[in-house]
A protein has these predicted regions:
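N-terminal hydrophobic/helix-forming segments and targeting peptides
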Residues: 1-213
Length: 213
C-alpha cells in the first residue's frame, strides 16, 4: 500500500516532464546521489559514488559507478520517459469567440485518446522563462496550478446528433479548452498571462517565454 501511495504522490506532483524531472531530482538527492553540471569538467567520478545530471529541465540521467572493472562486471541500463500525451499551449493562445468565451489555441502532444479529455476539469502546468538581472541567464520557474481552470466541452446532443455513432474529432477545432469569459476589451488577451503572473508572483513584462500544457 505504501508503494501505491508513493506512486500516486509522484504522479500528482509530476503532471508534465519538467515537474517530473524536478521530483525525480529531489528523490535522487534524498537517496544520496550527487548532482553534476554537465557543462563543467567531471574530475570527481570515482567507484562507489552515484551521480545525476539534467538536460533542458526535462530529462534526468542518473548513474552509479561500480567497484569492479567495467570489462568484467559490465553495466545495466534502465530507460523510461517522463512525458505523456497532452495538449501544448501555443504562444498568443487566447481565442475570443461569441459571448466573450475564451479558448486556448493548443496543439496535440503525443497520442492522446481525445474523447477522454472531454467534460472534465483540467488545469495548467509547465515552465515559464523569466527575465533576470543577467540578460544572458534568464530564470526558469516551474508552474503547477492545483485547481480546475479549463474544460473541453461536448456539444449538447441536439447540436451533434451523431455523437453516439462515433464522430471524428478535429484536433484544430473540437478540442480547444475553454479558459473563461471576458466582459470587456481590457481583459482580452490577458487571462492566461495574468494567471501566470498571479501564480508565480512575477510581472508581465518579465515573461520571456513559456512551455505550458
Amino acid at each position: 500500500m505504501d508503494h501505491i501511495k508513493d506512486l500516486l504522490q509522484f504522479l500528482d506532483n509530476s503532471p508534465v516532464n519538467f515537474l517530473a524531472t524536478e521530483t525525480i531530482c529531489q528523490r535522487l538527492v534524498d537517496a544520496g546521489f550527487e548532482r553534476l553540471n554537465a557543462c563543467e569538467k567531471l574530475d570527481n567520478i570515482k567507484p562507489g559514488r552515484q551521480f545525476f545530471f539534467t538536460k533542458n529541465d526535462s530529462s534526468v540521467y542518473a548513474f552509479r559507478i561500480g567497484s569492479e572493472p567495467l570489462s568484467e562486471a559490465g553495466f545495466h541500463v534502465i530507460c523510461a520517459h517522463c512525458d505523456s500525451p497532452t495538449f501544448r499551449i501555443k504562444p498568443n493562445a487566447e481565442m475570443t469567440g461569441e459571448g466573450g468565451i475564451v479558448r486556448l489555441n493548443t496543439e496535440v502532444y503525443g497520442g492522446p485518446i481525445l474523447s477522454t479529455w472531454f467534460d472534465r476539469p483540467l488545469t495548467i502546468a509547465g515552465r515559464v522563462i523569466v527575465r533576470s538581472e543577467d540578460v544572458m541567464c534568464p530564470i526558469t520557474k516551474l508552474l503547477q496550478v492545483r485547481r480546475p481552470l479549463l474544460q473541453i466541452s461536448n456539444l449538447a446532443i441536439h447540436f451533434n446528433r451523431q455523437v453516439n455513432d462515433g464522430v471524428k474529432l478535429s484536433k484544430q477545432k473540437d478540442v480547444l479548452p475553454i479558459l473563461g469569459i471576458i466582459n470587456n476589451e481590457l481583459e482580452k488577451g490577458n487571462l492566461l498571462v495574468n494567471l501566470i503572473c498571479e501564480e508565480l508572483n512575477i510581472e508581465q513584462k518579465d515573461i520571456l517565454d513559456f512551455d505550458l500544457y
